[in-house]
Amino acid sequence: QTSRRSGVRAARRSARSAPLPDHLKPVRAGMEGGTFSPLNKFGMDRIHQAVLDALETIGLSQAPQTGVDYLTAAGAKLGDDGRIRFPRALVEDTIARANRSVTLLGRDPRHDMELSGTRVHYGTAGAAVHLVEADGRQYRDSTLQDIHDAARIADVLDNLHFLQRPMVARDIADNLQMDLNTIYSCCAGTTEHVGVSFTEPEFVRHGLEMLHLIAGGQDAWRQRPFVSNSNCFVVPPMKFATESCQVMEAWIAGGMPVLLLSAGQAGATAPAPIAGAIVQATAECLAGLIYVNAISPGHPAVFGTWPFVCLLYTSDAADDLLCVDLGGRRII
């Protein structure tokens, strides 16, 4: 009888520790999101019109010459002041024809993420340069091993559906080696979709060579690109980041999806009123969307408005804010 009870207890423990089947998991990739609507239709229309005004009358400066060529060929206007301005018709046409059914792929197809509709996915993000040790609570520089460990953790957590490079490999001084080893450590740790940044446009061809090897060839990579480029292509307010734009162009040519990031701070690099910060971030990301579609119509691009608030008494960024799309469809 004692042996039987022990066997029952062991079976219960085994059942409790076993992974849940997909249909019982409380958080699943692509669950339909809720609705948060801080603005009514009139308010959203005002912001939309302000975005169009900003793109048409202010525009963005410091595009690389290749970007100027792509954008002016698509219908943007280069002013005598060097700023690229975007006619309303060009903006609205791009919105209408942009790819709205983007799927970010994992190396394992079960990790594919369809981004259409109100589907929500959670993952890591950021580029932390320090780590707090669990033992001793001491800060230290983050390392390549930390990135790999984070990828391994994300790979087995049900509520993390993709891996954005969460840390910087501070133990690698050479930027090319850092970029290549970051890709390798992320892909070695997870089969989920991976997001990475690159330092120089000249490094992209080396990154593509590695990705082709991991994928099993160039054709296999282009059929299932499992890494995207997290690209801060603007320096707010309303300036293109020249080298980041060149990196973006190179990755697009290599078949990589792009996450367009605008990270202005309300009260510092964006207007202090939240509505103004939203206008600027939306205008900047729309300029990026036009840029991407001017290079490759329909190329997969994620609209990554990322507005922060500057704490004026410390000049720090309050980065614990929600990013909400203007249609009230999903919270990230």
Where do the language-model regions lie?
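Acidic, glycine-rich loop-and-beta core segments that form the ion-binding/anion-interacting portion
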Residues: 247-248, 252-256, 262-308
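Hydrophobic alpha-helical segments, chiefly the membrane-spanning helices
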Residues: 325-332
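Flexible, glycine/charged-enriched surface loops at secondary-structure junctions
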Residues: 61-69, 80-82, 161, 220-224, ...
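Catalytic alpha/beta active-site cores
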Residues: 83-271, 275
